[in-house]
């Protein structure tokens, strides 16, 4: 399955919520009418079945983190094999992706831009260049913008946007040095309450 490269607003409208696919330079409401479904008329569908609700939740989370279906299923299988709640394990594995950590630290304005920074070798982990977006960052790892990319305007702008919206508590960032430490894996209570991971577990358990 190829990665989606179409309009980001269409995805947010499909799920009926902000998927944080846009940079936030302008208010989402000025660009996307997320209350309306995709299409010219944007009419909402009728009541969803239980399966439909579970599928939509899975698609929402998959699109938030920019993960393909095959990758997402792999994360679920890894989460199910670990101790603890499968749903929480799944979200933690997604949060530990390098492209997501780069986004959380504010080096990219979106996860998509952060993934591009990683792929273009603009990011290092513990002093070594890593160009794999799915690389699992561990507590204590130092994630930084490489010297050759420090002056990139999009990184400077992303840091400014992040300063406005605020950073998460599980990363410690030195914006001047464009470097940060991944302090710990976030607990479920630290993550979005708008995600119902139990629906995803129910979907894959069938």
Swiss-Prot record:
<keyword id="KW-0687">Ribonucleoprotein</keyword>
<keyword id="KW-0699">rRNA-binding</keyword>
<protein>
    <recommendedName>
        <fullName>Small ribosomal subunit protein uS4</fullName>
    </recommendedName>
</protein>
<dbReference type="InterPro" id="IPR002942">
    <property type="entry name" value="S4_RNA-bd"/>
</dbReference>
<keyword id="KW-0694">RNA-binding</keyword>
<dbReference type="GO" id="GO:0042274">
    <property type="term" value="P:ribosomal small subunit biogenesis"/>
</dbReference>
<comment type="function">
    <text>One of the primary rRNA binding proteins, it binds directly to 16S rRNA where it nucleates assembly of the body of the 30S subunit.</text>
</comment>
<dbReference type="InterPro" id="IPR005709">
    <property type="entry name" value="Ribosomal_uS4_bac-type"/>
</dbReference>
<dbReference type="GO" id="GO:0015935">
    <property type="term" value="C:small ribosomal subunit"/>
</dbReference>
<dbReference type="GO" id="GO:0006412">
    <property type="term" value="P:translation"/>
</dbReference>
<dbReference type="Pfam" id="PF00163">
    <property type="entry name" value="Ribosomal_S4"/>
</dbReference>
<dbReference type="GO" id="GO:0019843">
    <property type="term" value="F:rRNA binding"/>
</dbReference>
<dbReference type="InterPro" id="IPR018079">
    <property type="entry name" value="Ribosomal_uS4_CS"/>
</dbReference>
<dbReference type="InterPro" id="IPR036986">
    <property type="entry name" value="S4_RNA-bd_sf"/>
</dbReference>
<comment type="function">
    <text>With S5 and S12 plays an important role in translational accuracy.</text>
</comment>
<comment type="subunit">
    <text>Part of the 30S ribosomal subunit. Contacts protein S5. The interaction surface between S4 and S5 is involved in control of translational fidelity.</text>
</comment>
<comment type="similarity">
    <text>Belongs to the universal ribosomal protein uS4 family.</text>
</comment>
<dbReference type="InterPro" id="IPR022801">
    <property type="entry name" value="Ribosomal_uS4"/>
</dbReference>
<feature type="domain" description="S4 RNA-binding">
    <location>
        <begin position="96"/>
        <end position="160"/>
    </location>
</feature>
<dbReference type="Pfam" id="PF01479">
    <property type="entry name" value="S4"/>
</dbReference>
<keyword id="KW-0689">Ribosomal protein</keyword>
<dbReference type="InterPro" id="IPR001912">
    <property type="entry name" value="Ribosomal_uS4_N"/>
</dbReference>
<dbReference type="GO" id="GO:0003735">
    <property type="term" value="F:structural constituent of ribosome"/>
</dbReference>
């Amino acid at each position: 399955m190829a990665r989606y490269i179409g309009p980001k607003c269409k995805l947010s409208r499909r799920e009926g919520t902000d998927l944080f696919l846009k940079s936030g330079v302008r208010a989402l409401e000025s660009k996307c009418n997320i209350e309306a479904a995709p299409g010219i008329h944007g009419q909402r569908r009728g009541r969803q079945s239980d399966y439909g609700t579970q599928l939509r939740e899975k698609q929402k989370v998959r699109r938030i983190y920019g993960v393909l279906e095959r990758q997402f299923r792999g994360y679920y299988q890894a989460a199910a094999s670990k101790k603890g709640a499968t749903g929480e394990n799944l979200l933690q594995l997604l949060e530990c992706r390098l492209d997501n950590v780069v986004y959380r630290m504010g080096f990219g304005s979106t996860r998509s831009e952060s993934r591009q920074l990683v792929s273009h070798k603009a990011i290092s982990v513990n002093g070594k260049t890593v160009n794999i977006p799915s690389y699992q960052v561990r507590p204590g790892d130092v994630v930084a913008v490489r010297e050759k990319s420090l002056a990139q305007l999009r990184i400077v702008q992303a840091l400014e946007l992040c300063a406005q919206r605020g950073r998460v508590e599980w990363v410690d960032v030195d914006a001047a040095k464009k470097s940060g430490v991944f302090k710990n894996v976030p607990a479920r209570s630290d993550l979005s309450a708008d995600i119902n991971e139990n629906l995803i577990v129910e979907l894959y358990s069938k």
